[in-house]
């Protein structure tokens, strides 16, 4: 059904474009090839939601944490301990479940950080994954949620993350959080997300051609509404144990992680590591460059459907399309 509907709408889009120029929802905005990074950067200090913790084994050179809406609902988290550094990104909740005012993404992030804080310093990647999984699984059992979440994976507490282990000198990447290790950059984008982002973009382009305005989009995102039912269903792909499943992906959700899907990077002699969530469309070697790239997109493509195609844009009253976290460390060896 999805391909048929999309095919029909694409034909409609092409027909209308032949009749008139493509409606430019970005009119009065200039898309600059060279990013304007001449900004007031004071917000990086004033609006930073992370309170720095120090480690004897590495120096935190840059860090920033900011929720898309406010600190209380921020589903990103940063952790620095003597032997670990981590950025954890709780997935946007697809259910109405809350505990003490916290949605599932926030709860997942906090549970993962708690597990990392309890890691023995020389733990390996597989045991680390098991401990995080067990922490979330135990929460399900404690709150009588397990049976329901076994049947409805879309309601699971889900998070992605990147973790640096000083003792192992490795970075462990689970899901679509990002990292830079020396000259290596891994965004770890999921193929299924690109498909959904493109579907949302097409639906919204048709809506624009049919007369929707920016004010209309602030009230309702038709592309997001179109893909949302599948976003709820695609959870069946996370930690899916079926071999050869093209679209499966690893996450922290309280169920066994397939270790062959976890990326493990050997740091070697490199000294600089950057960890971030996917709240940054592209990760750069400095916080300001990463922020500048993000701001260029937010200024010129607030719906996140052209310059940067995403499964969601900026909601009215929010600062960005997603929470964001950035952590840059230099290793002492």
Question: Model-found features: residue ranges?
Answer:
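Generic short N-terminal amphipathic or hydrophobic helices
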Residues: 3-4, 22
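Short, flexible helical or helix-coil boundary motifs
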Residues: 17, 29-33, 210
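PP2C/PPM-type serine/threonine phosphatase catalytic domain
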Residues: 22-26, 37-333
